[in-house]
Amino acid sequence: MLYCGSTGGHYMIMTTNNNSNNNNNNNNNNNNNNNNNNNNNINQNHQHQHQHHHHQQQQQQQQQQQQQQQQQQQQQQQQQQQQQQQNYGESTTSTSMIPPSITTSLTPLTPTLSSQPQNIQQQQQQQHHHQQQHHHHHQQTQQQQQQILSPMMGSKRKLEEDMGVGQPTSNLTNEYLMSNNNSLKPILVSSPLLTPLSASPGLTSMQMAFANASLSAPSTPLSMSPSLGPCSAPMSPSKKSKNSRSSSKSKYQNSEERWQSTTSKDNGKPSSPGIVKGPWKDEEDAKLVELVNKCGPKEWSSIAAKIPGRIGKQCRERWFNHLSPEVRKTNWTPEEDKIIIDAHASLGNKWTAISKMLDGRPANAIKNHWNSTLLKKIGGDSKSLNKEKDDDDDDDEDAEDGSSPVLSPISLYQSSSSTTTTTTTTTTNSSEKSNIPPFALSGSTTTSTNNLNNSTNSTNSINNNNNNNNNNNNSSNTNTAITTNEPLVAPKIIRAQTTPNSSPSLSSKKTHDKQKVPQSPKNSKQQQTQQQTQQQTQQQLQQQQQQQQQQQQQQQQQQQQQHIQQQQMPVISQQPHIQQLPIDQQIQNAQFQQFHLQQPSMPSSTSVNIIPNQSSMEQHHYQQQQQAQQQQHQQQQHQQQQQHQQQQQQQQYLMQQHQQYQQQYQLMQQHYQQQLSQQHHQQQHHPQQAQQHHPQQVQHHQQHINTTHNQHQQQQQQQQQQQQQQTNNSQVNSNNTDTTFSNSHPIEPHEVPYYYDYWGSSTSGSQTLIPSDNTTNTYTIENNNDFLLFDDNQHRIQPLQQHQHIKQEHAQMSHLPYHPTQPNNLNTTTTTTNNNNNNNNNNNNNNNNNNIPTPNMSASTTGTINHHIHQTHHHLTTPLSQSTPSVSTDQNNYINYDISSLFSLPNEI
């Protein structure tokens, strides 16, 4: 099988055989030619280096880095050769197509096989000779550098070791090419008009594409040659690639390889051969958006410097055509199609001017939409229309393919002859002599191997004669290999696309097309028909717009007339709609109307006047009702205020009475304390007389207190009855009055003290000293004859532990001998006077038991009162020697204040 690879203006067919000696000779010959050409270019660059001596230190550092890189490359090449040797078989033949190795940016590459003209090489030789005389030292250093930087040094040494021959390898290539054998025909034709490969912006990207291509056959030593690999033709920087994300798969398997190919090894900046023409990746888009947000959509050169492999023009077009937020990505509407068709009829292919008519649609998108869909709708000839002037040649990035221009797919066919033939368009005498089939290059002629060999150096011509013998000896082996195999299949190469720089005719044609008039006379008929159809569509659109304007004007006029009529109409018709009366008012109005209808009819003259005044009468009636309601509301408020004032007066009166009662009570207390003090004084001197007169005084005092209490209770009942009558009257008069004030200000309860609240009432089982609702508790006397005691912190004291001590204190207080008794012994001897007094007090309390709170008294006063009450009550009941007081065990009836003063009476006295 044979494979063909081609890029730009170069075409190459590579054939291999099992004989590895011929392949190695070709590689070595090509290496020598490239080294000679590279030496010439190095000498030219050496003049600039001699002027800048201060850059030598930097170059040394760079050389060290490059040495390391080349060592890595040599190791990789050795590994590839080992794999190739393992894959080779003795009886099989295979071909492969691998791009040349990547060279450094310091030494620009030259066309293969010395394709430059002889004049150029002679000038280079003269310059080289002149530089050898003046700058011999610098040439030696530079030659050493070139030996280090040469990408094929490792492979050359490897081939010499494999061959085991000490003869120069540069003589092998010409012998192989000059052989008259028709069996093997390596074909390589290069145009003399091509620029050096270093000027080609798509070189490295294509090389990496071929390097990453997966082929079935293993690589051969031909792949080591920097000149026999497929290389791309130079492209103009103005030609843009396809930026659409929906393109085919990327030709780079690894992103690092892509960036290494696009950046130079010296400064890390994008070089001219490192411009990427492939589709944009997501990483590049994200980086571009970030840089535009920082720098703004202006400084495209600085933005492109931060994106390897991209120039400012590519960044600008990528932003404005795809990434800008102003770009619309929605489907095209029929309105937009009409605008484009109409604008194209008048302006032609001026896409930038047309894009100004559509918001969010860039010129490139409009152009693509025109070429893809609108031309089919119109039915015009796309070829004739595309011949017109296109003012937006720079915006055709989406119309082109994402990769560099390559040939169309190769079609293979079988031939009956043993030799290979190709279809050609032009032939020359030189190609017939060398038995090399010519290839059709656009605007260029083919050159033979004789012309190429004449332009080489004198040293190469001598070596070529020596290599002819080797090629003749090896021709027999190749003939046998080809005859044994089946008829070979030759590639049929069809040129699909050419680059602008590969042929001068394209560039001249392009400049000529730019100078053309947009509308040529050849296409005038077709354009006239298109213009007529477009004019008709424009007229229809204009008519529709006029009709719409007329309809809008009519609607505006109608609205104005309606507005004027509404202003002229009386207010009567609008009032029921503007403000509706409440339902009660509407019912009253209906009743009022029925009442007037029942009345006898008036003359026609009067009836005419009544109708327009009917609404005014309703309003007047409604106003009267509102006024009446307001008056009622004011009266109710006035009554409420009066009631509130009366309540306040009553409260003040009650407070005054309460204060008077407290004053009287305090006076009585003082008087009673004085009497008690006198009695104590008398008891010390005359204890027997005090015991006789004391019960009578207590009875007289209790009667006086009961009478005052009954009077006060009667007054309070009368006041409560008066308040109830007033509240009943107010509820009858005002059923719908506001009760918020009375609820928010309730009458506070008054604390009215009563005599029995302090002295208590005796029952059959207990005797209350200070009964109350929540604040005070009861003190009872039970049959167990035990006191319930509390300390200063109101903690209960165990009475059984201090029973003997208490009795001893009572005996000391009464100056009587102490007779200890058992706590369970019950004393049944009681006086009849105490029972009678208790019964009387109980009757009074039961009759007057109304939940009236007690007056607020301090703990000291209550303690002293209870002490005296207990003392007097104790003297009235039984003798101290025979009975002991008892206290109930009910915790709810305990006294919540300190009664320790009961037992400290002798000390105070």
UniProtKB/Swiss-Prot annotation:
PROSITE patterns the UniProt entry points to: HTH_MYB
Domain HTH myb-type: 272-327, 328-378
Biased composition (Basic and acidic residues): 379-389
Family matches, as Pfam families: Myb_DNA-binding (PF00249)
One Gene Ontology cellular component: nucleus
Primary location group: nucleus
Regions recorded as binding DNA: 300-323, 351-374
Amino acid composition bias (Low complexity), ranges on this chain: 17-46, 84-126, 415-431, 444-482, 622-642, 672-726, 733-744, 826-851
Protein's gene: mybQ
Keyword Transcription: yes
Biased composition annotated in UniProt, kind: Basic residues: 47-56, 127-139
SUPFAM superfamilies per UniProt: Homeodomain-like
Keyword terms: DNA-binding, Nucleus, Repeat, Transcription, Transcription regulation
Comp. bias (Acidic residues): 390-401
Protein species of origin: Dictyostelium discoideum (Social amoeba)
Disordered: annotated segments: 15-65, 84-149, 216-280, 379-482, 497-531, 616-642, 672-748, 826-855
Gene Ontology terms, MF aspect: DNA-binding transcription factor activity, RNA polymerase II-specific; RNA polymerase II cis-regulatory region sequence-specific DNA binding
Record field: compositional bias (Polar residues): 216-226, 497-508
Gene3D superfamilies: Homeodomain-like
Localization in the cell: Nucleus
Biological processes annotated in GO: mitotic cell cycle; positive regulation of transcription by RNA polymerase II
Name of the protein in question: Myb-like protein Q
